[in-house]
């Protein structure tokens, strides 16, 4: 039995985003090799499909993901790896579903920030790994 494109996308996004989340929690970095490989796989998968997540959809998904995360990077709220991770996820999801992932990420990030603040008993001037929030949003988008 050949897996459906949706199943392959779900597995690929899950592996990519959860791996990035674990690495970010451990090292506070999202490796370029991971985001680059994920984006390359997303584009390669898109070349085999048409429609919403064909090659045009993959490129638009990356551009939308990058555009949504860029202000946070420019303001110093997120790291470059976080920006590249959402862009890579966008190659799998396309522009419409990466937008859903972004909103899921914002909600997940808010909850993670609150939990981090409560655990640390510090509510201001703190940082935390953001790839787990991106993973929450990406998983929300693929399982929605």
Kindly give the residue locations of the regions a language model identified.
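A membrane-topology feature that recognizes alpha-helical transmembrane segments
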Residues: 1-144
